[in-house]
A protein has these predicted regions:
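Short histidine-centered loop motifs in beta-beta connectors
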Residues: 181-196, 225-234
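N-terminal intrinsically disordered, acidic low-complexity segments at the extreme N-terminus
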Residues: 1-29
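Short inter-helical turns and helix N-cap capping residues of alpha-solenoid HEAT/ARM repeat scaffolds
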Residues: 77-78, 114-115, 146-147, 178, ...
Length: 302
């Protein structure tokens, strides 16, 4: 029995497939030109490279040579470079690196630097070596800094010097930040209560007839928004517009310091963190209990 053959009709776009079926003839594939390939791979490489370069330039863990450290400490155009150098300094100091002493005068100089984040990091760094000449006095002056975070870090560092002069500032680290409206007007934008916020994070915007643009209200501390006036709310200058609870790390460091220098008067600020609540971590709760116990033991109170 002969097997009939099948062929495509003349002039059609069909062809016979290996299984004997017919179908449209596949269109020829268009390959990218050399220029297109170069552009494609270059774009892909940049997509990967640019975030890496940003991370590399902002990551404070990247090691700096002695020359780079000196340059970064004086880079007024890039305050984050100064912060990077201070973090590296603190690490060297904590490991008793004698070579780090050559930059100690720079740490004292930066104690009144105009950028808050630099002063904040500087206060922490000076606490890494209690033998640093001039550090103690510089930290005492920083207790009067306009920034609550700088005051707090200076107070924490002073504890390493066995100096409890900053105890009120340490207790303040346990308390929420109350933010008042700088102008009278109405809220046009605001974040939601319960939202985590970093230091300097935007909380709300207030518009008034006297200003061409809304005034931004920012958080002075890292933490979580407890309350904030919502859009449409009228506010008057000096009235409370937001409350931010301190972050876990800040609270934990303050409790550790008060374990050493706390007094009975500080217990009302400590005991809220002893509660078994979802927003209080086990580490913080345990530290609060230990701090409470240590303070009462020093005072001879059961």
């Amino acid at each position: 029995m002969s097997i009939p053959s099948y062929s495509a009709a003349p002039g059609s776009d069909s062809q016979i497939h290996p299984d004997g079926s017919t179908g449209p003839e596949p269109k020829p594939k268009h390959s990218m030109s050399r220029t297109q390939k170069i552009l494609f791979f270059t774009t892909g490489w940049l997509i990967v490279l640019m975030p890496f370069l940003f991370w590399w330039n902002t990551w404070f863990g990247r090691h700096l040579s002695n020359q780079q450290l000196t340059e970064y400490l004086h880079d007024d155009k890039k305050p984050r470079h100064i912060q990077h150098a201070l973090v590296q300094m603190g690490d060297r100091m904590s490991h008793a690196d004698v070579a780090a002493k050559q930059w100690y005068p720079e740490l004292i100089r930066l104690a009144d630097y105009p950028v808050e984040q630099v002063r904040n990091t500087d206060a922490w760094a000076m606490g890494q070596d209690t033998s640093g000449a001039g550090f103690h006095q510089a930290l005492l002056k920083m207790l009067a800094d306009p920034s609550p975070m700088v005051r707090g870090n200076a107070a924490l560092s002073l504890v390493r010097f066995a100096d409890a002069a900053g105890r009120p500032q340490i207790v303040a680290l346990l308390q929420p930040a109350m933010i008042d409206a700088p102008i009278s007007g109405h809220v046009v934008d605001a974040d939601r209560p319960g939202t985590a916020v970093h230091q300097g994070g935007l909380l709300a915007k207030v518009a008034s007839a006297d200003s061409s643009a809304p005034v931004e209200i920012r958080s002075p501390i890292p933490g979580r928004i407890r309350s904030v006036s919502q859009p449409g709310t009228n506010v008057v200058v000096g009235a409370e517009i937001a409350v931010v609870d301190p972050g876990t790390e800040q609270v934990w460091e303050a409790l550790r310091a008060l374990y050493l220098v706390g007094q009975l008067d500080d217990l009302p600020a400590i005991r809220p963190y002893e509660r078994d609540l979802p927003d209080i971590s086990n580490d913080v709760r345990q530290q609060a209990l230990e701090t409470d116990k240590a303070i009462r033991a020093r005072a001879g109170v059961n």
